[in-house]
């Protein structure tokens, strides 16, 4: 019997970037199609959709290439409805390595946003299509960078917070603190979403969805940290399955090694 997954794969390979396979999940394909249709103009919609996809790839490459500089390799990058995911084969263990790996993605997004702003203000750009694409790229990458710095898992900000806290305590306790901070933010975000729904504002359901994701992934990350600590106390090798960015992927099997 042929498995349906083999007949209808969840994602397709679109290219290789710096030797890293890049896949496109079908959930994002649907979003990009709706994105194109929503703009009314096929040319503008397609341009903005491509700018979005390329910006996410650049963001994830920031994680992947920084990790590579520390000797940690990336299996692939997958773009999905919830954003990008760089699947690291092994995770950085030192706090400063995790900090730089996590912060690299938002840093790339801010650099792209800054370059788009400089192009708009200091280059002789007059064509309407070029101006709109640059303007959209500027704001899109700025929002992408800020969103990923939110202090909770699975966003980069959660890992940045944990890496800083790890300097003063154990990794497990730092993960717990990051989870609590993230859940506090998730509660505020959920309340904001409920208020938007009641008052007829925008992004209400999206805010609640993000809050739920932060709540769930924070606990999952903490459980992983506890299992890792338990395994190391017995002198066993540790492997885990994770999914939140910047780590994870399709099979989500990751080796965590000690340098």
What are these regions (language model features)?
Residues 1-259:
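Hydrophobic transmembrane alpha-helices and their immediate loop junctions
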């Amino acid at each position: 019997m042929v498995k349906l997954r083999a007949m209808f794969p969840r994602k397709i390979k679109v290219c290789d970037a710096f030797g890293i396979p890049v896949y496109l999940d079908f959930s994002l394909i649907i979003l990009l199609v709706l994105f194109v249709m929503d703009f009314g103009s096929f040319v503008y919609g397609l341009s903005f959709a491509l700018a979005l996809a390329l910006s996410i790839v650049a963001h994830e490459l920031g994680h992947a290439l920084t990790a590579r500089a520390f000797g940690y390799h990336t299996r692939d990058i997958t773009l999905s409805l919830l954003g990008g995911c760089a699947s690291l084969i092994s995770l950085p263990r030192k706090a400063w390595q995790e900090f730089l790996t996590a912060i690299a993605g938002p840093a790339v997004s801010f650099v792209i946003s800054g370059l788009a702003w400089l192009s708009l203000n200091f280059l002789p750009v007059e064509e309407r299509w070029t101006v709109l694409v640059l303007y959209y790229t500027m704001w899109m990458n700025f929002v992408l960078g800020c969103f990923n710095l939110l202090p909770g898992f699975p966003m980069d900000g959660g890992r940045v917070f944990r890496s800083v806290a790890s300097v003063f305590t154990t990794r497990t306790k730092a993960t717990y603190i990051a989870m609590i901070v993230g859940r506090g933010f998730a509660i505020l975000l959920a309340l904001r979403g409920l208020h938007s729904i009641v008052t007829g504002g925008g992004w209400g359901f999206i805010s609640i969805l993000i809050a739920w994701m932060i709540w769930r992934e924070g606990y999952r990350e903490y459980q992983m940290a506890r299992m890792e600590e338990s395994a190391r106390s017995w002198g066993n090798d540790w492997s885990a399955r994770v999914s939140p960015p910047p780590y994870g992927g399709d099979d989500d099997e990751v080796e965590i090694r000690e340098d």
